[in-house]
Amino acid sequence: VLDKLEQSKKEYILLTNAPRPNNTVINFLKNLGLDQSKCKKVSTSGEVALKYLKSKYKALKFFHVGPPRDFDLFKSFEEFKVNNLDESDFIICTGLYDNFSENLDYYKNLLKNKIDKKMVCTNPDLVVDRGSNREFCAGSVAKIFEDLGGDVEYFGKPYPLIYTQSA
């Protein structure tokens, strides 16, 4: 399909709600066998969020909700990561913790008294289907936070910023 688009001289961007920087997803796609020239046209929700975080939340302490595999998102400012939610200025949500991937009540209890903080959600998807398994995504945690009265900034499809930043 991408070859046909290029032959037709059509522009394209591969948009993904992966909560990781572009280079992480590009390396993944290369390992799958995607031609390197096509990998240059990748834009992730994580990359768009990262640019925003560096400009708006520079040097502020954050608490991460999500699995360790997403740590590469904030590697360039990891010195501001705190392990105590009360010490944070804001929350970055990239997904669910591996040991609480099916228990949304855990997140309701974790966040219920923290709605004074802003949450940045790097993947607004509520669920993802992996084969025959349906798994919750960061958007499910963000929705809980919003339902509690918290304020969430979303990065990824279908929210506008991923389209304007990727163009």
Where are these regions (language model features)?
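HAD-like aspartate-dependent phosphatase fold
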Residues: 1-167
